UniProtKB/Swiss-Prot annotation:
It catalyses: (R)-pantoate + beta-alanine + ATP = (R)-pantothenate + AMP + diphosphate + H(+). Pfam families: Pantoate_ligase. Catalyzes the condensation of pantoate with beta-alanine in an ATP-dependent reaction via a pantoyl-adenylate intermediate. It comes from the Bacteria. It comes from Shewanella woodyi (strain ATCC 51908 / MS32). HAMAP family: PanC. This is Pantothenate synthetase. It is an enzyme of class 6 (ligase). Keywords: ATP-binding, Cytoplasm, Ligase, Nucleotide-binding, Pantothenate biosynthesis.
Length: 281
């Protein structure tokens, strides 16, 4: 696997593959990889001739009081895992390569409405940072296909919307959430949890399952959500949000809409966890 911080080297390697008519899949990450990331790489290898990955802890998507400095960096272990999974080219830029004029002078990409709610409301500017860096990475790598985990459901929808709105010739594929045996969605931030907190955190998925079951049985949506919030509180969570939305566009649920998604964000101690569950009522 080739590892480089240089945009030009990425483009030269991509050009070499393109001249042979070969296809490119791309998996952007922030590193500290787990099985969910590796699943994306392996799936990418099935869908294209070559797999490109990136590791970049993007400062633009972190708020002033968030965990940018504390975010785990495990580059050497990540490189081994990516190579073993089938990645052939790894882009590891520094912030001054991605934002040479600094973030304040950076042209940015913002997806309105869908990016202003849920996590966007809780973390102002977060999705502007995500959309900007993903758009830049897409322009550098110019893949045929890019893969993202469905655990970050709102992020996936924002990226799909951005690609459609900007007419980028890239297929965006969402891959199912990989979970631990307890049901807890795999996340780089799970490493912040103590053993006891990790056990408690499994209640997040259980609560979403209970909400889904209640709604399918005809329960009031508001009541199902209120019961779910109380279950989270009783299990030691501090809920940020727990909402039912239309799975197609994250709009509020109205009569006649059957493809739904439960979106959850809650704190276990100081660690903010997110998850979601799509279902048909």
């Amino acid at each position: 696997m080739i590892t480089t911080q240089e945009i030009q080297q990425i483009r030269e390697q991509i050009r070499t593959w393109r001249t042979k008519g070969e296809t490119i899949a791309f998996v952007p990450t922030m590193g500290n990889l787990h099985l969910g990331h590796i699943t994306l790489i392996k799936e990418a290898a099935k869908r294209a001739d070559h797999v490109v990955a990136s590791i970049f802890v993007n400062p633009m998507q972190f708020g002033a009081n968030e965990d940018l400095d504390a975010y785990p960096r495990t580059l050497e272990a990540d490189k081994l895992a990516l190579s073993d999974a089938g990645a052939e080219l790894l882009f590891t830029p520094t912030p001054d390569i991605i934002y040479p004029k600094g973030m304040e002078q950076q042209t940015y990409v913002e997806v309105p409405k869908i990016g202003d709610q849920l996590c966007g409301a809780s973390r102002p500017g977060h999705f502007r940072g995500v959309a900007t860096v993903v758009c830049k990475l897409f322009n550098i790598v110019q893949p045929d296909i890019a893969l993202f985990g469905r655990k970050d459901f709102q992020q996936l929808m924002i990226i799909k919307t951005m690609v459609e709105d900007l007419s980028l010739p890239i297929e965006i594929v969402g891959i199912d959430t990989i979970r631990e045996t307890s049901g807890l969605a795999m996340s780089s931030r799970n490493g912040y949890l103590s053993t006891a907190q990790k056990s408690q955190a499994a209640v997040l998925k259980q609560t979403m399952d209970q909400i889904s079951s209640a709604v399918k049985q005809g329960a009031s949506l508001d009541l199902a959500i209120e019961n779910g919030k109380q279950a989270l509180i009783d299990s030691g969570f501090t809920p940020d949000y727990l909402e039912l939305r239309n799975a197609k566009d994250l709009s509020l649920v109205t009569d006649g809409q059957d493809e739904l998604v439960i979106l959850a964000a809650a704190y276990m101690g100081n660690t903010r966890l997110i998850d979601n569950l799509c279902f048909t009522r």
